[in-house]
């Protein structure tokens, strides 16, 4: 898996690195002919002042108009994609893709081992949940003296509590992993397609042709998605095989046992009947117990409410929108193809939509009706827990 992670990180370079094409153009290898429209000298001349590797920096594009004044007009239209810091432009697409891929890799890698999985769950899930539970209890106590302040505080805590549970349940689900991988794949594929639509005419024909080296990055990015589907199918097949083997073993034990007389057959049936039904019953009970989370009453209340279901499926819709929007926003269908922040406005829009749903749904749900502390239980008919 570590080798696969390294290969995917390498595959991200030609996908997200528009700085590679700009650096190659800004520092072309010796012997490259520059047309007069780009050279600014009035004629085609030979570029010989670059002796290093053109793509020496994968994260930043070194640009200084004083050193290369010819490229100032060319890169002026692309500078909006980078954050200008001194004489360096930082490509956030590379940073975003690398962070997303690294998070998904280490998150799923740590979940493979019991010790790391338990530590991760304790640090990111259990401890914040315990703190929110303590704050919830304190808000209930403050309601007796400060009703309005206590209810407002309780409302804010329950909003955070609900969002915390929904997000981590979504990330722990199989669909959450697939959506994160698909989001990275869609963004990277859009970058490859955009690079094929090269605006520099001297490289348009070469960049428009798909070769083995251009297809390999897509194959490497698709591999985690294929592995995730394969893992899902293998789990289902193993579960079906295990259930079938349990049933066949119990039936075979009953069929192969001799029944010499009626008394022995009755005794045999009394002994074999628990053997037949005990294993499937225990499996069913364990699966039901695992489905019912052994959390606090507040967590069980949140998971059984309708805002939890709405928010859970809303995350699916928002990530599906991001998967569709990012390739379209970076294509030639939009004017702001080279405006990075305009193309990525969907990220804060998705976050804002999620929190707006949380704020609207929580007070009108069973969470608000049954959990809001009230200083006068007889009047409201609510029991303070």
UniProtKB/Swiss-Prot annotation:
- Please give the function described in this protein's UniProt entry: Part of the gene cluster that mediates the biosynthesis of elsinochromes, pigments consisting of at least four interconvertible tautomers (A, B, C and D) that have a core phenolic quinone to which various side chains are attached and which play an important role in fungal pathogenesis. The non-reducing polyketide synthase PKS1 was proposed to iteratively catalyze decarboxylation between acetyl-CoA and malonyl-CoA subunits for polyketide chain elongation.
Cellular localization per UniProt: Membrane
For this UniProt entry, what is the primary localization, expressed as one broad class?
membrane
| ATP-binding as UniProt keyword | no
Signal peptide positions on this chain: 1-22
Q: Which gene encodes it?
A: HP2
Per UniProt, the keywords (alphabetical) are: Glycoprotein, Membrane, Signal, Transmembrane, Transmembrane helix
Q: Give induction info.
A: Expression is up-regulated during nitrogen starvation or at alkaline pH, conditions highly conducive to elsinochrome accumulation.
Task: Supply the source organism for this entry.
Answer: Elsinoe fawcettii (Citrus scab fungus)
Tell me which residues are glycosylated.
187, 248
One Gene Ontology term, aspect cellular component: membrane
Q: By what name is this protein known? A: Elsinochromes biosynthesis cluster protein HP2
User: What stretches pass through the bilayer?
Assistant: 94-114, 148-168, 209-229, 309-329, 344-364
In the bilayer, the protein is annotated as: Multi-pass membrane protein
The reply to whether Transmembrane figures as a keyword in the UniProt entry is yes
């Amino acid at each position: 898996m570590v080798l696969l992670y390294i290969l995917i990180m390498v595959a991200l370079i030609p996908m997200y690195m528009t700085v590679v094409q700009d650096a190659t153009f800004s520092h072309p290898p010796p012997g490259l002919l520059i047309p007069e429209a780009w050279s600014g000298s009035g004629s085609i001349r030979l570029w010989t002042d670059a002796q290093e590797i053109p793509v020496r920096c994968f994260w930043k594009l070194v640009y200084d108009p004083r050193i290369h004044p010819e490229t100032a007009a060319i890169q002026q239209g692309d500078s909006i994609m980078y954050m200008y810091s001194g004489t360096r432009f930082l490509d956030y697409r590379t940073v975003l893709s690398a962070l997303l891929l690294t998070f998904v890799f280490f998150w799923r890698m740590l979940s493979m081992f019991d010790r790391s999985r338990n530590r991760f769950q304790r640090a990111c899930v259990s401890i914040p949940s315990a703190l929110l539970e303590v704050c919830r209890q304190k808000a209930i106590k403050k309601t007796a003296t400060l009703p309005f302040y206590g209810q407002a505080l309780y409302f804010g805590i329950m909003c955070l509590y609900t969002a915390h549970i929904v997000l981590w349940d979504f990330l722990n689900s199989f669909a959450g992993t697939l959506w994160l991988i698909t989001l990275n794949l869609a963004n990277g594929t859009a970058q490859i397609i955009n690079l094929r639509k090269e605006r520099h005419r001297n490289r348009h024909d070469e960049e428009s042709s798909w070769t083995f080296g251009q297809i390999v990055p897509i194959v490497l990015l698709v591999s985690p998605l294929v592995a995730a589907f394969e893992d899902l199918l293998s789990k289902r097949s193993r579960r079906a095989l295990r259930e079938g083997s349990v049933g066949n073993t119990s039936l075979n034990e009953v069929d192969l046992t001799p029944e010499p007389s009626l008394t022995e057959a009755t005794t045999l049936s009394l002994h074999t009947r628990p053997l037949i039904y005990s294993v499937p019953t225990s499996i069913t009970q364990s699966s039901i117990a695992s489905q019912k989370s052994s959390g606090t009453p507040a967590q069980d209340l949140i998971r059984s409410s309708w805002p939890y279901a709405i928010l859970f499926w809303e995350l699916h819709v928002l990530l599906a929108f991001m998967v569709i929007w990012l390739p379209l926003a970076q294509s030639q269908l939009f004017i702001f193809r080279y405006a990075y922040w305009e193309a990525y406005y969907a990220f804060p829009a998705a976050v804002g939509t999620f929190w707006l749903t949380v704020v609207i749904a929580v007070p009108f749900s069973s969470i608000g009706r049954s959990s809001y502390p009230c200083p006068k239980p007889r009047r409201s008919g609510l029991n303070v827990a």
